[in-house]
Amino acid sequence: MTEHVQDENKLIAERRAKLEHIRTNCPANAHPNTWQRSHKAAELQAQYGEQTKEALEELAFQTSIAGRVMAKRGPFLVIQDVSGRIQAYAGKPVQGDLKERYQGLDIGDIIGVKGQLHLSGKGDLYVNMEEYQLLTKALRPLPEKFHGLTDQETRYRQRYVDLIVNEDSRNAFIMRSKVVAAIRNFMVKKEFMEVETPMMHVIPGGASARPFVTHHNALDMAMYLRIAPELYLKRLVVGGFERVFEINRNFRNEGLSPRHNPEFTMMEFYMAYADYKDLMDLTEEMLGSIAQELLGSTSMPYGEETVEFGGAYARLSMLEAIQKYNPDNATIQAMTYEQVKDVEFMRDLASSLGIKLEKFWTCGQLLEEIFGETAETKLMQPTFITGYPADISPLARRNDNNDFITDRFEFFIGGREVANGFSELNDAEDQDNRFKAQVDAKDAGDDEAMFYDADYITALEHGLPPTAGQGIGIDRLVMLFTNTHTIRDVILFPAMRPQA
């Protein structure tokens, strides 16, 4: 057993003994539930922080606070609640039983304090401890006692401790909540209706991904956690709800990375009588307004870059982006869509770029892999990439001028995809054929190919109006707004392998 563990175990034993003493001598004080808080720390700081010492003395303002003890320096305590920190002072008036109980306080305990508000000689607000109650005894010490909570894995496994001691972590999740609220408000103002669609699907669909499989006992059948809500949302558009959106979780049985968590949050929306260009315009308006609302600016730092959310964003086709970021590759510079349609040409090109090939890859998949390998990470500023091939866009409408590609875009910021949108395929016969092609791809070994959904075809046969739809990755968007570079830092409880 290490010295660190021995010291921690000793402290835990001491704290348990203190709690047992309270239970024995005054059981009602072990875990009381009657304390009434009148103010949060930030409220007191905002209302009285600018007062002079003399003015506060004359005011004789009484308050009741509650929170966690974060520091204990002689007669002063630093108490933290959800809004911030404030001090409490246990001076000469603290005598007898109150003094004894104060001396038994440990860092991490949750307490309530009542008393008059004062200003210290250093200009800090504090509450004079005229009444005090231990509300919860913390049996484990906070990690500052043991060199701080610096281990990333421990931060993710014990997020509750991370939130107690790391202000940056708390602020990131506060910002996440604000981003989601701002998106929801924006959509409602644009007359979108928020809906909820099934989380368990009989047929997984709406995206190319490997699903999680579960079993419905009562129906004795396999079901799938949803990989996307798309097909259900478009059924609602068929039903006459012309603008719908949903903010909820998707599940994809794939790997973990700084950009991927198997359980993640998406905002997906659909609007009738619109196309993919309308979606790009709406995205520019949405992100610019949200950045201004939450940050007070349309510019924000991200790593060593400054991302600009104001104004119009760059728009490039996938082929144009590949050519832009491979200026010295003569083959790429001369490449045309006719060559992109040649699978042997594309396999040779991808191989020459060091890309490990899969036998079942189509021309579109090869083009996407080349884009991902040579261009994607260079898209730091907000950029719409258009011209996605039809064979990797089974739900998107074909382009009128080039049926090899679709009216689809993906939206990139900070070198990663944040959103995906397109004019929806509303030709039931074309959709039927594309679903069948996906089944063939799955049979050829593509685990992420889509399933055939006969009921969705039936819905399309009732008539889907011209529609555009988009999904925005909330987690990746929050990474930008919080200047963090791993998705685990913006998911409260990310997926982790169980500890042995």
Swiss-Prot record:
* Cofactor annotation remark: Binds 3 Mg(2+) ions per subunit.
The cofactors it requires, by name, are: Mg(2+)
The answer on whether this UniProt entry bears the keyword Ligase reads yes
Gene3D superfamilies registered for this protein in UniProt: Bira Bifunctional Protein, Domain 2 (3.30.930.10), Nucleic acid-binding proteins (2.40.50.140)
> What Gene Ontology molecular-function terms does this entry list?
ATP binding; lysine-tRNA ligase activity; magnesium ion binding; tRNA binding
SUPFAM superfamilies per UniProt? Class II aaRS and biotin synthetases, Nucleic acid-binding proteins
Q: Which residues bind Mg(2+) 2?
A: E417
Q: Which branch of life, at top level?
A: Bacteria
The entry's localization annotation reads: Cytoplasm
Q: Which UniProt keywords apply?
A: Aminoacyl-tRNA synthetase, ATP-binding, Cytoplasm, Ligase, Magnesium, Metal-binding, Nucleotide-binding, Protein biosynthesis
Q: What class of enzyme is it?
A: ligase
Per its record, the protein catalyses: tRNA(Lys) + L-lysine + ATP = L-lysyl-tRNA(Lys) + AMP + diphosphate
Keyword set includes rRNA-binding: no
Question: Which cellular component terms (GO) are annotated to the entry?
Answer: cytosol
A Gene Ontology biological process noted in the UniProt record is: lysyl-tRNA aminoacylation
Record's subunit section: Homodimer.
The protein's name in its UniProt record? Lysine--tRNA ligase
Q: Which organism is it from?
A: Shewanella frigidimarina (strain NCIMB 400)
Q: What lineage is this protein's organism placed in? A: Bacteria, Pseudomonadati, Pseudomonadota, Gammaproteobacteria, Alteromonadales
